[in-house]
Structure formats: structure tokens, C-alpha cells
Amino acid sequence: MEQKIRQNGNAEFSMTISTSRELWRYLFRGQKNSSEKLTRVEAFHDLIERQYAALQQENDCIFGSISSLSRAWHWDRDTTSAFITDLEKFGAVSRYDIGKRAVLKLNCTIG
């Protein structure tokens, strides 16, 4: 476990929590978003579902575009792109582009 020391002298730890698709489905059960615009948590859950669907079709990756994700989440392209970039920084997704198409892969353990 990585330990960092804050300015006030208290230790700050980096923590990684493994979750499952079933846990995410449980957490969202009964939740209704009052607007069409998804929250970041809902968008991440959507990526989990897209990754699961891709794996069922024997694909390792989610194929699409920032525009298609923007439309699905009711976000603008800049916000969507920044969100994916942030997820990359956290190590949650890997991304590469083929032309205008984004290829995303959740960094997950399959079992």
C-alpha cells in the first residue's frame, strides 16, 4: 500500500477497491435520475455495462466515438473527453483512437 504524508502530518493512503458488475447493478437498483443527463457515476456504470456487452460478443474493447458517448450521456464532447482522460489517469480505462473512433477498455479482471 502506498503511503503519502499530508502537510498536517497525517498519513494518506492510496486504496484500490475491487468491485463487480453485480455490485454496481445493486447500487443502482431503484435509482431514477430526474434528468436525462447522466452523472459521472452513471456514466462509469454505463461503461461497465458496455464492457460487459463487448465481452459477451468476445470483444475485449468498447468501440465507439466520443460523440456517441456524449449523445448517450447527454454531455458535450469536451466534458466526455475530459471524463475519459480522467478515468485513464485513475487507471480505470485504457484508450486509443482509430481515426475518429475511440477504443476503450475497462481495466478489469475477468473471472
Protein language model annotation of sequence segments:
Residues 51-111:
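Winged helix-turn-helix DNA-binding recognition segment
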Residues 1-68:
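Short recognition helix of helix-turn-helix/winged-helix DNA-binding domains
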